[in-house]
A protein has these predicted regions:
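Short S/T/G/P-rich N-terminal loop/turn motif that feeds into the first structured element of a domain
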Residues: 1-67, 76-85
Length: 85
């Protein structure tokens, strides 16, 4: 199965707004795909955040849902995909 790592920067003034939007994103993604994300912040840098989604079985459906649901965040996002070695 595939794990997705989506990272981006957030203006410090928008962190709480983005936090609420990310929770709504996680709820929608979980409803549609059964995959629950985790929101993380870079340890040594307060403006870099990451969404982690593990054990994605249906990549096509997940990517479609992620693209659709994340558009509302209005952030430039970078997505990386990893599989178990």
């Amino acid at each position: 199965m595939t794990s997705y790592y989506v990272y981006y920067r957030v203006d410090p003034a928008r962190v709480e707004t983005v936090r609420l939007a990310v929770q709504a994103l996680f709820d929608a993604i979980e409803r549609e795909t059964g995959v629950r994300g985790v929101w993380m912040r870079r340890r040594d840098e307060a403006t870099t955040f990451m969404e982690v989604y593990d054990n994605v079985a249906d990549e096509r459906a997940f990517e479609a849902a992620l693209s659709r649901e994340s558009a509302a965040l209005g952030l430039e996002r970078k997505t990386e995909r990893f599989i178990c070695a």
